[in-house]
UniProtKB/Swiss-Prot annotation:
Catalytic activity line of the entry: 17-dehydropreakuammicine + H2O = norfluorocurarine + methanol + CO2
Pathway entry: Alkaloid biosynthesis
TM region(s), chain numbering: none
Complex and partners: Homodimer.
Molecular function in Gene Ontology: hydrolase activity; methyl indole-3-acetate esterase activity; methyl jasmonate esterase activity; methyl salicylate esterase activity
Presence of the UniProt keyword Hydrolase in the record: yes
Role description: Hydrolase involved in the biosynthesis of curare monoterpene indole alkaloids (MIAs), natural products such as diaboline, a pharmacologically active compound used to regulate blood pressure. Curare alkaloids act as animal glycine receptor antagonists. Catalyzes the conversion of dehydropreakuammicine to norfluorocurarine.
InterPro entries: AB_hydrolase_1, AB_hydrolase_fold, MES/HNL
Keyword Plastid: no
Active site, UniProt feature: S86, D216, H244
Protein name from the UniProt record: Norfluorocurarine synthase 1
Length: 266
């Protein structure tokens, strides 16, 4: 099917990062749709307007179920462009592992991007190794939840951290929106520590592209370049002036990058 601009219509599936939800794509979604594409933005479990609480989800697989259910419902023969942001890269990878035949390419935006050799925990730990050792968490809070038998740790980003490390190139109104809508997050560290490497036949068989945000202060820019060089992609882009939230601070540039990737490899 052709889109409004005469080009082949694509179906983009947008996967948000930790603490966020489908709402964070509110600028990008209509831009892609105005080019004639179909766009689906999902809420992962305990995110956005998903009704479940964080203490009701124990594993990364459970957290990713809305994405997996969406992928399962895609008719045979149809393919999507899967777009994962930040921590959403892990959920994206899980979908690639289970439904490689339904994904034409996976695009990682300032995101963790595993390979088909090392376990996910390897890349989870690398994020912290690449981060500044003396980084000030500012008003970010660590909260305990769960039971004495199964203690869990949640992270709640504070307004100062968001405005200076995550949304620093966004407007005050956009930062306020995030403050109002962001939910506590779990990084599922215990679950990730037990997970095996993704397979070459599943995850590894899907084409990958990467978009680097060159003014990112929360997901190390150097690590983003390292992932491109060491994990490997068939296409990479750099968005100049983009903070971690490129879909909000640089939506037009992000749309252009996604369009170029789709045109080239799909």
């Amino acid at each position: 099917m052709e889109g409004a601009n005469g080009k082949q219509q694509k179906h983009f599936v947008l996967v948000h990062g930790a603490g966020h939800g489908a709402w964070c794509w509110y600028k990008l979604k209509p831009l892609l749709e105005s080019s004639g594409h179909k766009v689906t933005a999902i809420d992962l479990v305990a995110s956005g307007i998903n009704a479940k609480r964080l203490d009701e989800v124990d594993t990364l697989h459970e957290y990713s179920l809305p994405l997996l259910e969406l992928m399962a419902a895609i008719p045979p023969g149809e393919k999507v462009i899967l777009v994962g942001h930040s921590f959403g890269g892990f959920s994206t990878a899980i979908a690639m592992e289970h439904y490689p035949e339904k994904i034409s390419i996976a695009v990682f935006i300032a995101s963790v991007m595993p390979d088909a050799v090392n376990p996910p925990s390897y890349f989870f730990n690398l994020v912290f190794e690449w981060s500044p050792k003396d980084e000030d968490p500012l008003d970010t809070k660590i909260e305990e939840y769960g039971s004495p038998d199964q203690p869990r740790t949640a992270i709640r980003y504070g307004p100062k951290y968001l405005s200076s490390k995550v949304y620093q190139n966004c407007t005050s109104e956009e930062i306020e929106l995030a403050n109002l809508l962001l939910r506590p997050i779990s990084l599922f560290a215990e679950d990730l520590s037990k997970a095996k490497a993704f397979s070459a036949e599943g995850y590894g068989s899907v084409k990958r592209a990467y978009i680097i945000c060159n003014e990112d202060k929360s997901f190390p820019v150097g690590f983003q370049h390292w992932l491109v060089e060491n994990v490997g992609v068939i296409e990479s882009k750099v968005i100049k002036g983009a903070d971690h939230m490129a879909m909000i601070s640089k939506p037009q540039q992000l749309r252009q990058c996604l369009q170029e990737i789709a045109d080239k490899v799909v």
